[in-house]
Amino acid sequence: MDKRTVVTAVLCAAAALGASAAVAELAPPPEASAPVRAKAAQPSTSSQASPRAQEARPQLSAAPGSTLPPAVTPPPGGPAAFTGALFTDGLDSDHFCTATVVQSPGRNLIVTAGHCLMDGDQSDGTAVFAPAYANGVAPYGTWKIQQVYEDDRWAEGTDDDFDLAFARLAPDDRGRAVEDVTGAAVLDTTGRAGEEVTVTGYPADRKVPRTCTAVAVRESATQQRFDCADFPGGTSGSAWIARDGKIIGVLTGGDTDDVSTSTVLGDYAASLFAKATAGAKAASPAGR
């Protein structure tokens, strides 16, 4: 079962002849015995999304006929450019988690939460990453997920202290690596926690990202907490970026939409990143 409260109510359906209420979806009821903390939204039937990421269906908040502000393309090299949404099957499908481009020799890696994706080869899947996505537009394009790397303690045992994943992306239609287009953030795996961080995530019920800055709190040797209102399902995988621009956490869950958690990125994250880097570099188009 997921780690975030699963939506169980039905939204009001749009009334005929001019009503502008949102179209309703019915989400599957949660199992009574399971914890409810995940912030991943259900991505329909894609083989690339993990079971936890499939349990809370997104509900679009924009009413039929409503207008949204135009998308603005952020300049490359900043978080607004290299942070994006994960989609099950192109931009016409649901977005269910958030991911961030991370600097790597192959220039083709993103980091997200482990419960967002399935470990292993995903070359036959359909999930894509859309950096800087907003209002139905992906200004930089989309990149297909090829391979997912997770710690065995998460992939086989779902230990929350290891809820982290890296994904290798295929080149886009023009043969470009994602980092060459959007820029990327540096991953810090020295175990930093309890610092001011800025977090950008994609709520599943919206078509624009949500950003907040606050001071994280170290909860234990392996967990840290970030208190900021309105980080619901879909924001799983959001990078916690410190003031020096480095990623020191990745949003994995929270008991409410106002409390978010991350593992402390220590030795296990360094080992996993090394594994992903080796695989991604070997598979990069230029062999870099």
Predicted regions and their residues:
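Catalytic histidine site
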Residues: 76-133, 216-220, 252
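Structural recognition of the beta-strand scaffold that forms the well-ordered cores
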Residues: 85, 109-111, 165-168, 198-199, ...
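Catalytic nucleophile loop of clan PA
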Residues: 230-251
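N-terminal low-complexity, Pro/Thr-rich disordered segments
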Residues: 3-12, 17-86, 265-288
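Conserved catalytic-core segment of clan PA serine endopeptidases
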Residues: 69-81, 87-90, 127-174
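Terminal interaction modules at protein C-ends
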Residues: 133, 155, 255, 272-279
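Solvent-exposed loop/turn segments at secondary-structure junctions
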Residues: 92-93, 106-107, 116-119, 135-137, ...
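Chymotrypsin/trypsin-fold serine protease catalytic domain
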Residues: 145, 160-229
